[in-house]
Amino acid sequence: MNSDLPARPVRIGVQLQPQHAPEYRQIRDAVRRCEDIGVDIAFNWDHFFPLYGDPDGAHFECWTLLAAWAEQTSRIEIGALVTCNSYRNPELLADMARTVDHISGGRLVLGIGSGWKQKDYDEYGYDFGTAGSRLDDLAAALPRIESRLAKLNPPPTRDIPVLIGGGGERKTLRLVAEHADIWHSFASADEYPAKAEVLQRHCSDVGRDPAAIEHSAAVQDGGGLVPNAQALVDVGVTLLTVACDGPGYDLTAAETLCKWRDSR
């Protein structure tokens, strides 16, 4: 285990992918079931079309769902894994986040990234640019979001936690060090320590305590869900996520991880 990180409680997150569910009630029932089985945080994603399966299948919009989830749940945290920075003016996004924070009673996590799915951009009229330009736009947007959150009346109910996903060592991890409360990585347990070390160097460069950043990662099923979860915990990850999609939203993996978390 990375001894430089604090002893945080292990938390379980579920990404309820808002695809292939032709009726909203299917998603609503899934987020309520997440709360019932003890999931700590329910995520969706910020796309306009399915990422797999029928490319033109049923799909719902991210932030409208989060506002509904805020009313339809009472304990679980909610957020996007992750919001695409390109799709909304930073000041507007800050106001949206503040509003959902209030609706939920302080349970929103603001997950954000630079965006990557070209079909979303092309179909909805956004400039796709390059990976580098999108990261530069994210770097410019984050201070604007923070500034607007500080000006809004009423203010957020809490300092809304910011989650940034990705592992780019030069730009993305620098943004994590500067702005994030949670870092979501897509690295395996074997790859993770090297990425975490890069993040620690960025934190040192910007004067940030790396222990202030919670580490999050997706748990893969191949080779065993629980062993894979434990391997991530052993290298310092404490927010463990799994994903499922519609129409059925099978929460078997999430329930397994919740039981494992509670038995530790």
Language-model region placement:
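Active-site-adjacent structural elements that line small-molecule/cofactor binding pockets in enzymes
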Residues: 1-264
